[in-house]
Amino acid sequence: MSKVKKNEETLSEVLVDVNRVTKVVKGGRRFAFSAYVVVGDKAGRVGAGHGKAKEVNEARGKAKQAAKKRMMKVPLYQNRTIHHDVVGKSGAAKVILRRAKAGTGVIAGGSMRAIFDSLGVHDIVAKSIGSTNVYAMISATFDALNKLASPKSIAMRRDKKVNEISVKSSDIQVNE
């Protein structure tokens, strides 16, 4: 994950999960709230964070600060979709992210949709397999987003030009 400087005014915030948690002590039960927040600038930067406090608003604020610390830059194709299909895993959760043509929209469920909206993705197809736990789904989605690479970065890594690694499907010859 690459660290990115944050600009407070342009970040959108989505509250993904709020949960009341209990700590049992000698004198009884102590209640608190945990919150999970996704923040993004709708231009290729996104982060997620978790916070816990006695009040919901405090927990949300802590989660937002944690999310801003964990923001990452994601390479987008034409500022609307991802460059290539990718799979991410976290525990029993598995997500498959597929690029989509213009006009397709965001086809994703729950917490994944919050990430893509905050990221600024307009066309993507996402499928979740296995666990549907919010924390696992977000972690698996971030794992997949970490695996994304632009053709330019792949070309630099291989010491080649972009047109040498980008191949059209019509250029592939199949020997039968």
From Swiss-Prot:
Q: Give the intrachain disulfide bonds.
A: none
GO BP field: translation
GO CC terms on record?
small ribosomal subunit
Domain S5 DRBM: from-to ranges: 11-74
Q: Which GO terms describe its molecular function?
A: rRNA binding; structural constituent of ribosome
What are the UniProt keywords, alphabetically?
Ribonucleoprotein, Ribosomal protein, RNA-binding, rRNA-binding
Cross-referenced Pfam families, in alphabetical order? Answer: Ribosomal_S5 (PF00333), Ribosomal_S5_C (PF03719)
Q: Which InterPro entries match?
A: Ribosomal_Su5_D2-typ_SF, Ribosomal_uS5, Ribosomal_uS5_bac-type, Ribosomal_uS5_C, Ribosomal_uS5_N, Ribosomal_uS5_N_CS, Ribsml_uS5_D2-typ_fold_subgr
Can you tell me which family this protein belongs to?
Belongs to the universal ribosomal protein uS5 family.
Annotated PANTHER family = MITOCHONDRIAL RIBOSOMAL PROTEIN S5
Listed under subunit, the entry gives: Part of the 30S ribosomal subunit. Contacts proteins S4 and S8.
State its role. Answer: With S4 and S12 plays an important role in translational accuracy.
Q: What is known of its domains?
A: The N-terminal domain interacts with the head of the 30S subunit; the C-terminal domain interacts with the body and contacts protein S4. The interaction surface between S4 and S5 is involved in control of translational fidelity.
Put simply, this protein is called: Small ribosomal subunit protein uS5
The lineage is:
Bacteria, Pseudomonadati, Pseudomonadota, Alphaproteobacteria, Rickettsiales
